[in-house]
Amino acid sequence: MALTVFEHASALWYRLQGSVSLAVLSTLAVVIAGWYILSSISLYFSRRQFIALHGCKPIANRYPSKWFGINFILEAGRTYKERRYLDALTWNFRNIGYTHEVRALGGTSVWTVEPENIKAVLTSKFKDYSLGNRPAVMGPLLGRGVFVTDGEEWSHSRALLRPNFAKDQVADLSMIERHLQQLLKMIPDDGKAIDLNDLILSFTMDSSTEFLFGESTETLTSGINRQFSDAFAYSLHDISSGLRLGPWYKFRRTDPKAVQSHRICREYADKYVEKALEYRRNYIKSVEDGATDKPSIDGGDSRRTFLRELALATDDREKLRDELLSLLLAGRDTTASLIGSLLFSLAKKPECWEKVRSEIEETLHGDLPSYEQLRNFKYAKYCVNEALRLYPPVPNNAKIAIRDTVLPRGGGPEGRDPIIVPKDAPVIYTVYALHRRYDLFGDDADDFRPERWENQRYTWEFLPFNGGPRICLGQQYALVETLYVLVRFAQHFSKIESMDPEPWTESLALTVSSGNGVKVKLERGSSDVHGLSTQGVLIDYGGLFAPTQKVPGTGVTQISKGKA
């Protein structure tokens, strides 16, 4: 059948349209390819200029990647499951190089335990790095808190929180003692073996929530707030899993239990934020009315808690909640990790336990410790430092370069020259391996030996709480709470014996802890302290682990000996 004029025209139009579409697509492909080639050439020459300007040399050491680096990923997964991931990283640094490059799936990362490199990342080149995927992974729980923000937003959070760690606001020692007493009650009197791990976590949860919220979860006693405690633990588990996936975290399936846990935690914090804002409103009203008494809520509660002090600085509900949960993460897990590792180590070293007990008894004679006495316990502090060295609570950290930048070590034949870190490349520094370098800490760097701290001071070789502008705000809180627990345990128990025949094994999440728990047998001494009268006493944390001058006019109240 003959085609009509209309059908001829339609066929011609479709042929022309197809030709035009093909021409457009071809042109677009050529433009994109040309742009990519020109961009690559431009990047090549600009990086050559950058390398020459900074004297960078090719990196000296590389991980032996195979199958596009899949062997590295498989090895990391295998050693993590075997609970020896950190030891495997330490082996890499000792045998490949203290700074080396890893190539996997088309990406390049730099791994380092060189103090000068870590110092550069955390100080002089601080603005060249971001947190990578941390905000996206941790955001569902922590929102826009201090641990998940960069730049001006982070600076604002830091400035908001810093005043609340002033010396006279850090902790009420009677509060720590009260929760410690609940912990001691959970330890059997008959000398039976016990795993202290969960008890320590409950203790730090209870003390941290009272310090931050103004009200404890009391998980060691009533367990009324166990839902929040369990939800918080599961939220941290979910975050840890997401961070381990790195850039592939986006492809994991949503965990409904994690979503529910995040919601429970945020709603729990919201209740206390609202109370703090009510305190703020009453405070402003009392100032306007010229009142001299502290404002109160709930029928007369006028305590000055951490959250209330924070609420006096801002009335942003989300900000208060996000910062509160961020600090709880640090206060609960970091301190629990340190206390657990310390007691695990001392249980394996009875001679060290005896030295701690002797030092404390010679000083206290059955009294509760004063702040000045805590400052002067040399051997006890050596033990705390040694636990931090061997088992830093946060053993691994990473930053992502947001522009081409430089590390001062790792290039050239000897690895002593600068190297370039390209934009978007991760830099991973492993504090766990840094603290076990034989050239820095001796041939016995893998051993628990507190005496190494007698005549030795370290700077960027010892980083249990990070360094630079992002150094942990609450490090003195964690250190003093740990030291106080050690002193009180030494007063309470004459012996601590390890019931775990195996060496320390890692359990790696956001923090690291003993994978087999803290299984010990404790023998109570003939006497404890002469009394527990620490009511209403404040402790000054400033300078506990480093000599400092007391600043006049700070309002710091020293604690006195607590006798009955």
Curated annotation (Swiss-Prot):
Keyword S-adenosyl-L-methionine set for record: no
Pathway as given in its UniProt record: Mycotoxin biosynthesis
Cofactor(s) essential for the protein: heme
Keywords of this entry: Heme, Iron, Membrane, Metal-binding, Monooxygenase, Oxidoreductase, Transmembrane, Transmembrane helix
Localization (cell): Membrane
GO cellular component entries: membrane
The keyword Secreted appears for this protein: no
Binding site for heme: C472
GO MF term (any one): heme binding
Enzyme class: oxidoreductase
Transmembrane segments: 18-38
Chief site of localization: membrane
EC number from the UniProt entry: 1.-.-.-
Protein's membrane topology: Single-pass membrane protein
Cited PANTHER family: P450, PUTATIVE (EUROFUNG)-RELATED
Family membership noted in the UniProt record: Belongs to the cytochrome P450 family.
Reported function: Cytochrome P450 monooxygenase; part of the gene cluster that mediates the biosynthesis of fusaridione A, a bright yellow trans-fused decalin-containing tetramic acid with antimicrobial activity. The PKS module of fsdS catalyzes the formation of the polyketide unit which is then conjugated to L-tyrosine by the condensation domain of the fsdS NRPS module. Activity of the Dieckmann cyclase domain (RED) results in release of the intermediate fusaridione A. The unstable pyrrolidinedione ring of fusaridione A is opened through a reverse-Dieckmann reaction to afford its ring-opened form.
Record protein name field: Cytochrome P450 monooxygenase fsdH
Source taxonomy: Eukaryota, Fungi, Dikarya, Ascomycota, Pezizomycotina
